[in-house]
C-alpha cells in the first residue's frame, strides 16, 4: 500500500487551499479519528491512482491565529463547529481548480463508541464518502503521478 502523504510547510497551506486540483488533509497524528481515517484514505487514494495527499497538522493551525483566520476564511461555513478554534479531525478537503468542491470532517455519524475501531461497515461508509470527494475533483479519473 502506497503512502501518498506529503507534509505541508506552514507557508504552503493557504496556497494549496487556493490553487490547483488536489486533496488536503488536516489531521492530528495522535488523534484516534485521524488514525482510523488514514488507512481508509490510503486505500481510496490508491484506487484513484492518487500519489499525493497534502497533510498539515491541525494543532499547528490552532496555535497560529493568522493561519487559522486564513484557513477558516477559505473553508467558510463548512465546519461542523464554527465556534471552536480547533478542527474536528480529520478534515479532508477536495479542491478543483482552486475551489473547494468537497469537504469532510470527522469520520462517520454512526461512529459513537470511541473505545473501538471503525467497524467494516463504517470503513465502507467512510470509503464511499472519500470516493465521492475524489470523483468530485477528477470526474473519477486521476492519472498516475498526478496531484489529485
Model-inferred region functions:
Residues 23-26, 53-57, 91-94, 102-103:
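Structural recognition of the beta-strand scaffold that forms the well-ordered cores
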Residues 1-11:
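N-terminal "domain-start" segment that seeds a small globular fold
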Residues 33-35, 63-66, 101-104:
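Extracytoplasmic/secreted cell-surface and envelope-processing proteins
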Residues 70-85, 93-95:
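Short, internal strand/loop/helix patches
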Residues 24-30, 60, 114-117:
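Second-shell loop/turn segments in exported
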Residues 5-7, 26, 50-74:
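Thiol-based oxidoreductase modules, predominantly thioredoxin-like and allied folds used
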Residues 12-55:
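Local sequence-structure signature of Cys/Sec-based thiol-disulfide redox active-site neighborhoods
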Residues 85-148:
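Non-catalytic, surface beta->alpha helical segment in thiol-disulfide oxidoreductase systems
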Amino acid at each position: 500500500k502506497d503512502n501518498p502523504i506529503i507534509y505541508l510547510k506552514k507557508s504552503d497551506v493557504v496556497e494549496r487551499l487556493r490553487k490547483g486540483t488536489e486533496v488536503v488533509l488536516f489531521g492530528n497524528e495522535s488523534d484516534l479519528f485521524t488514525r482510523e481515517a488514514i488507512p481508509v484514505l490510503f486505500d481510496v487514494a490508491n484506487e484513484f491512482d492518487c500519489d499525493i495527499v497534502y497533510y498539515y497538522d491541525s494543532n499547528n493551525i490552532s496555535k497560529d491565529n493568522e493561519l487559522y483566520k486564513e484557513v477558516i476564511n477559505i473553508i467558510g461555513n463548512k465546519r461542523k463547529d464554527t465556534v471552536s478554534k480547533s478542527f474536528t479531525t480529520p478534515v479532508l478537503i477536495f479542491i478543483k481548480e482552486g475551489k473547494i468542491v468537497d469537504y469532510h470532517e470527522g469520520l462517520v455519524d454512526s461512529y459513537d463508541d470511541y473505545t473501538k475501531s471503525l467497524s467494516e461497515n463504517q470503513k465502507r461508509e467512510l470509503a464511499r464518502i472519500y470516493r465521492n470527494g475524489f470523483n468530485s475533483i477528477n470526474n473519477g479519473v486521476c492519472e498516475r503521478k498526478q496531484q489529485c
